[in-house]
Amino acid sequence: MKTTQFILASASPARRRLLQTVGIEPIVSPSDFDESQIEETEPGKLVQILAQCKAETVAPQFPSGLVMGCDSVLAIDGKIHGKPIDADEAIARWQLMRGQVGDLYTGHVLIDNLQNRTLVKCQVTRVYFANISDRTIQAYVATGEPLKCAGAFALEGFGSLFIEKIAGCHSNVIGLSLPLLRQMLEELNYDVTDFWK
């Protein structure tokens, strides 16, 4: 038995837009899971744990649905960076990141309630940051965009000006890896076209 009900356990507009771009119109049901209770220092494990907790919080509401949870963090020199809490932190973060290379980790979880199966995966994309001035950093932070994103930048917005290049999956940096999603759906015996609207 298969479902065509795709639930996104995230309030992220970027993740929703990515899914819509490939023909999936998800039911958006943000998780209220408290991320602060997880104390994991390895970024790949952290994003998988958080993505799974988010999906598991939402899954019981959709007994015949396919629930996707995601979480992203940026790691530079092994230090994990999530969303900055305020403008001062975003400025300090950019002063640290400029001219550096970071790894953007996104945990992906699919819970198929009909098949009683859960898949947990992580995708990593390398991000090369431009060496930008303090003035540019302050102007970028003033847009508000860095306060909404893991790593304090949005590849799909103003932040794209300050990324020299990426190595790996482009959509992963925006919020979820579309190629990995397709592979996970296939592993659950779905075709991505099953969810096209």
UniProtKB/Swiss-Prot annotation:
It catalyses: a ribonucleoside 5'-triphosphate + H2O = a ribonucleoside 5'-phosphate + diphosphate + H(+); a 2'-deoxyribonucleoside 5'-triphosphate + H2O = a 2'-deoxyribonucleoside 5'-phosphate + diphosphate + H(+). The keyword Cytoplasm applies. One of its GO terms (biological process) is nucleotide metabolic process. The keyword Lyase does not apply. Keywords: Cytoplasm, Hydrolase, Nucleotide metabolism. The active site is at D71 (proton acceptor). It comes from the Bacteria. Its cofactor is a divalent metal cation. Its EC number is 3.6.1.9. Nucleoside triphosphate pyrophosphatase. May have a dual role in cell division arrest and in preventing the incorporation of modified nucleotides into cellular nucleic acids. HAMAP family: Maf. This is Nucleoside triphosphate pyrophosphatase. It comes from Trichormus variabilis (strain ATCC 29413 / PCC 7937).
